[in-house]
Amino acid sequence: EIIYQRSMMKKGSSMSRNNNSLALKAGKELKKINGPRVAVFEVGGFDTHAAQGGIDGSHSDSLIEMDGIFKNLEKGLGNEMDNTLIVTLTEFGRTIKQNSGLGTEHGYGSAIFMGGGLLKKSQVYSDWPGLKNKDLFENRDLNSTIDARSVYASAMSKVFDVDFKEVQKEVFWNDNLQNLSDKLFKT
């Protein structure tokens, strides 16, 4: 851990880089005419098998870090936030109920958080089945009702101005995905 922290320090500085300062810098770079089109941030700590906590736990800490990234990107982007899409990505969801260690296990369904001016509106877009046991996958997980790849393919199509079918073919190997662009993004 100490080697990682020191490797992220600027020579002559006592301040190590963190996602918040990187997000601010990334926002400033992304808004440049010839700047990059994509920035990627990693937020760990969501694999909370034990001691997940509530408003004070490690899960909350990770969500606060995500919020800081969103805020600093917006600050760095300024008015260019109107032409921006922020998309979160995860490899797994979490179970609904806590385990005996006050954490959660890997789950089936999940959520994708998005922000930015390219979104059609503030919304929860879902085919929500509910939280009753009969509605859960294997009586423990959110049921996955929308293929996350449909969201990602639609986002790529919108942001990079590439035909959805082309993204579907070249990135997702012609899998049967739903184009959600008209439901999620401004035209």
Show which residues each predicted segment covers.
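Ligand-binding pockets and gating/stacking loops
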Residues: 1-187
